[in-house]
Amino acid sequence: MFKLKYFILLICIATSFAACKKAELYSPAAQFTADTTAIRAFITANSIPAIKDSYGVFYQILEPGSGSFSYSGTTKVTVDYQGRLLNGTVFDDSNGTPRTFTLGGLILGWQIGIPYIQKGGKIRLLIPSYYGYGERAAGSIPANSILDFTITLTNVM
């Protein structure tokens, strides 16, 4: 009985120390570096002629569209799109029914990428998690996910 008390005390002390262990901290810079490395490997493996912009978003203009619209946060964009994870899993799709959004209300990756095209244009965006949903999960999108979007801009106003 006496040994059992010491054993239980030892378990309690060990549990207390384990509970005090510091959680691993999230590092946006380290995650961004990891995302960039993964995107570069993906575009190389899939022969995608993507360009990396100054923010770190990779894009491929499939069709530039026409016009000379100047975008702002209040710009309304009507888009047909499909969103995928790098493993090919589709997490969102407008299914040929264009949807209208305010540009400033969209994820940063879209705010950065959509202005590269004009009405009628089509773009592929490979978005590091920092410019997507970051360290939080969103629906079927896991935390720290790189996003792969193909977007057709059907209207802009």
Q: What kind of feature is each model-predicted range?
A:
Residues 2-6, 16-157:
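Cross-family detector of peptidyl-prolyl cis-trans isomerase
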